[in-house]
Each structure stands twice: as C-alpha cells, then as structure tokens.
Design a protein with these regions (language model features):
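A solvent-exposed interaction/effector surface
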Residues: 4-141
Length: 141
C-alpha cells in the first residue's frame, strides 16, 4: 500500500510524504499556467481511496474502452479524449471538506463537449508523480 500525504503551507506550497515510493517517481517542476479539460466528481476527503478508483472504472474504463481499441472517435466526447489526451492526468482540487477529482488532459483548444469542464492552474511549482505500467496500479495496491 502506498500512503501519500499532502500538506499546504501558508505560502501556497505543499509538502508530500510518501511511503513505499519505490514504484513512483517524484519530480518538482515549475509550470506556467496550465488549462485542463476533463470531467470530475466531488469526493469526501475520507472516501478518496475507495471512490477515486471507482470513478476511473465507471467513467473512463467502461465508457471509453471501445475507443482505445479502435482509436477512431465516433462522437465529440471521444474526439476530445483523443485530442487532449484525457486520462493523462488525475487532478485533485480542494473544495473544503471535499475535493474535485478530475480525469483530465491538457487542453489544446477547440470545443468542450457537454459533461466536460475546463480548469486552470496558475503558474506555480508542481509535484509530479509518474510511474510506468498499468495506470493507477500504484495507488490501488
């Protein structure tokens, strides 16, 4: 099991503590403003470990598995997924006692299909976690 703890300081910086981090790479990087496109759900802070994987399975796995077999979009939603690499990012946006959990991609312009939203982060320092292999496996085990 991997435990990730985020702490936000009063200077809008955060610290990350990871246990069993040998399966993930952590890199700090300054990023210019970035805008993402995707879809999200509201999750209570104490339910993230259970609800985040469920959201991926339901919203991404079940709905778009055919798309990733053919790589031929059949509608505006599938086109947006391919053009913006939706699924490349999992974003967590604090919303008080809950957080918005996003399945997202970097917005490259164009139309925003119904059910999708845009979210922009100001320029700041980022903590980037990456892994090779099946997506979400490090968070689920």
């Amino acid at each position: 099991m991997i435990t990730i703890t985020f702490s936000l300081t009063n200077q809008n910086k955060f610290f990350v503590k990871i246990k069993k981090a040998d399966v993930m790479k952590l890199e700090y990087k300054y990023q210019k403003e970035m805008t993402f496109i995707g879809y999200y759900t509201e999750i209570k802070m104490n339910e993230g470990y259970e609800k985040c994987p469920e959201f991926w399975d339901k919203e991404y796995g079940e709905k778009y598995s055919k798309l990733f077999t053919t790589m031929i979009p059949e509608n505006d939603v599938e086109r947006a997924i391919l053009e913006n690499n939706i699924g490349m990012y999992a974003l967590c946006v604090d919303n008080g006692g809950e957080f918005q959990y996003w399945i997202a991609g970097e917005y490259k312009g164009g139309s925003v299909p119904d059910g999708f939203s845009l979210y922009s982060f100001p320029e700041s320092e980022w903590a980037l976690f990456s892994t090779k292999g099946p997506s979400l496996l490090p968070f689920r085990n």
